[in-house]
Amino acid sequence: SPKHSNFYYKGIPVENHKTFLDVFRYKLAAPMNELLHTLLNPREVKLCGGIYQVHIPSPEFNALFLTFHAAQHFGNGIRLHHLLDWAFLLKKYGWCLPKEVTDERLLDFICALTHLCNRLLDMDIPVKGGEPIVSIVYEQMMHPLYPPHGGVPVKGVFAILRYKTKRLLYIHRMQAMIFDHSLWRRIWESIVVHIRKPKTILMRG
């Protein structure tokens, strides 16, 4: 992947990211990725009574990274753990999203996540905006139309191609609520992937 490589450490899969965000796909990701570098400000935290020391990024870094990462999965794999990550951060630090985050569609998505924290997790974070997409985000988490790891539930060449095409268009439509990304580029990226790995064209797993 142009974004990250994978390796295993003691049997645990690890993603070694080249960038914090997917700057190769989303136009908004590039300036947000640069902002994350300025927000990093790691500080040392002692664990287990001081036996271990780890460095953690600033709350502002985590606020932007966690919410943007969740947005990248909108329509294609957003899960309850994305909401819980945001809820834990809100509970610890409150609303600490950097003031430099001004994109209205991204802010609407973050507000929608926050509304769900209030409704589902009994939190009380003041938030305004994002109401029109709250139910969409909820359905994506709890009842995804195209589960990312659910495989292809149809058989036959035509049925598989039709299912995958509908899934691609659906994912694009969902992510277009937040990001500017060309449909034709998404289609071209899919074509290139399948040309490189022809066996994946009709793969159902």
Language-model regions: role of each:
Residues 1-205:
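Conserved NTP-donor binding/palm subdomain of two-metal-ion nucleotidyltransferases/polymerases, i.e.
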